[in-house]
Design a protein with these regions (language model features):
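Acidic, PIN/NYN-like endoribonuclease modules and their adjacent C-terminal/linker elements
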Residues: 1, 99-132
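Short, well-structured N-terminal submotif of metal-dependent ribonuclease cores
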Residues: 1-38, 49-58, 114, 121, ...
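Non-catalytic, well-ordered alpha-helical scaffold segments
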Residues: 7, 40-43, 61, 96-99
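A cross-family signal for key residues in well-ordered alpha-helices
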Residues: 10-11, 44, 82, 100
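Active-site-proximal, substrate-binding regions of enzyme catalytic domains
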Residues: 37, 43-75, 83-85
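Active-site neighborhoods of divalent-metal-dependent phosphate/nucleic-acid chemistry enzymes
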Residues: 70-112
């Protein structure tokens, strides 16, 4: 079981060529967990990639279908609010939500955003994979 950050899912599905290291990590992780926020963040990233012509809209539709096939256990963010607030000086509320969930579940957070790993006071393992 792991908590998967949006950056890792994007690299596993949307970055071309696909980030094989992240793809293999997610495939072998067992349960993938994330706050409900992941769905909106994922769509936001796809939108940006299409708008900046980094990704064709037809490809984005195929990636959305691949994303829909992922089995991700989604968690409400409200029980995480206190820890998210505690992290406010060093992390965005979005990043802190993923961190807080990993801490609550006692599992690693898998990311492709190395700045998150340098946040002080984290209470969980952070697995950083190079961005694709």
């Amino acid at each position: 079981m792991i908590v998967v950050d949006t950056s890792a899912v994007v690299d596993a599905l949307a970055v071309r060529p696909v980030n094989r290291l992240v793809h293999e990590r997610l495939a072998g992780a067992g349960d993938l967990c994330a706050p409900h926020l992941i769905d909106t963040e994922f769509l936001s990233v796809l939108r940006r990639l299409v708008r900046t012509c980094s990704l064709h809209s037809v490809t984005a539709d195929a990636i959305r279908n691949d994303y829909a096939q992922l089995t991700i256990l989604r968690f409400d963010h409200l029980p995480l609010s206190e820890r998210v607030w505690e992290l406010r000086h060093n992390a965005s509320a979005f990043d802190a939500t993923f961190i807080a969930l990993a801490e609550l579940l006692g599992v690693p957070l898998v990311i492709c955003d190395e700045r998150i790993a340098s946040i002080p006071g984290l209470r969980t393992a952070i697995e950083v994979y190079p961005a694709g």
